[in-house]
Amino acid sequence: MIYLWVGVAGFIGAAMRYGVGAAFYNADAFFPFSTLSANLIGSFLLAWFTIGLVQHRQLPESLKTAIGTGLIGSFTTFSTLSVETVMLFERGSTAAGVLYVLLSISGGLFTANLGYALGGRKKTE
């Protein structure tokens, strides 16, 4: 049954990823901003989910796996980042390729840290 939940959540995450890609797509952009946006949002969400929902609330393992691996895992796109970076270098856009990788890694760490910090806050009651 877990495969079904991961698959359903993965379908939703992939559809969300497509929506972000369509919303942020710009053919004239210096580098692929749509992929960067999806990966930064996904880094934040996975960290927030991991600390905020998993550690502070009782959730079934199947739901944790479906959301973390299925939904958020299909939303983020490391393979697309890799291919787009190679394409930037191949067409001679070295500065854009380097900037894209640096922003992806540093931005991902920053948004993951932010999600972790916000998810770890205890609610005042």
Predicted regions and their residues:
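Membrane-interface helix-loop junctions in multi-pass transporters/channels
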Residues: 1-125
